[in-house]
């Protein structure tokens, strides 16, 4: 898994930071990309990456403020144009009202999509998605309007098959290897091959938590518990805690406190006020690292491998 930030600014675009959008790239795990929020000009930012819109199969919206959703109608339309040969359905998760917003934009603009949008409007905490390899949980944060955070949990995967040991034990390479990998006991040439003797320990899945705008809250700690990566907003420097609270946001220190309390491995800060440019960004990093050392302030198009 990899994460890439398409926009890291707060409120409105600036010369150095676009509005909010984050791509969780799971190409190796499921050949998909999941998008978290879709602020204005997100599709333009995508043009500066290797992301293919048709690979985006799920979009998770944290809340309905414009800097998190104004890019949706344009992106959804362009996804249809750019994916004419492979029209795959898209799942859209978000607060109640996201369906009305999207459909109104498409209807008024006369836009017609070549794929289906499956809307999943959320009004309470809980598990919102599960398949054989992933689960997604959501909970309510503390912002000025209804706002969500998301916890993406990769399920543990079967360990590596020791092919050399099987060959040395007399099992020829072929379909029987696959059966053992699936956990089946195999009898061959008078011998019994038990999977537990030839498969290593399970590979522990990654946990990624991506939060919308929020004050410091215990909900954030729960969503981020023992996560490999936490993406937390840090609109303000530590000295502006009163302003942060008044506007429903967090400071660098508050975000780092959440990461520390939750036992998070890596903390990436986003939703940075336009007032922080140049050396001031370094100040934000230092403030957070004083509390949680493994912290970085993301910038537009920044990408890193998770774990």
UniProtKB/Swiss-Prot annotation:
Amino acids binding Zn(2+) 2: 67-68, 213, 271
Cofactor mode of binding and number, as noted: Binds 2 Zn(2+) ions.
Cofactor: Zn(2+)
Keyword set includes Metal-binding: yes
Gene3D superfamilies: Ribonuclease Z/Hydroxyacylglutathione hydrolase-like (3.60.15.10)
A GO term for molecular function: 3'-tRNA processing endoribonuclease activity
Catalytic activity: Endonucleolytic cleavage of RNA, removing extra 3' nucleotides from tRNA precursor, generating 3' termini of tRNAs. A 3'-hydroxy group is left at the tRNA terminus and a 5'-phosphoryl group is left at the trailer molecule
One Pfam family it belongs to: Lactamase_B
Residues that hold Zn(2+) 1 according to the record: 63, 65, 143, 213
Broad enzyme group: hydrolase
Active site: 67 (proton acceptor)
Annotated family: Belongs to the RNase Z family.
Classification via HAMAP family: RNase_Z_BN
Record note on quaternary structure: Homodimer.
Role played: Zinc phosphodiesterase, which displays some tRNA 3'-processing endonuclease activity. Probably involved in tRNA maturation, by removing a 3'-trailer from precursor tRNA.
The name this protein goes by in its record: Ribonuclease Z
Organism for this UniProt entry: Lactococcus lactis subsp. cremoris (strain MG1363)
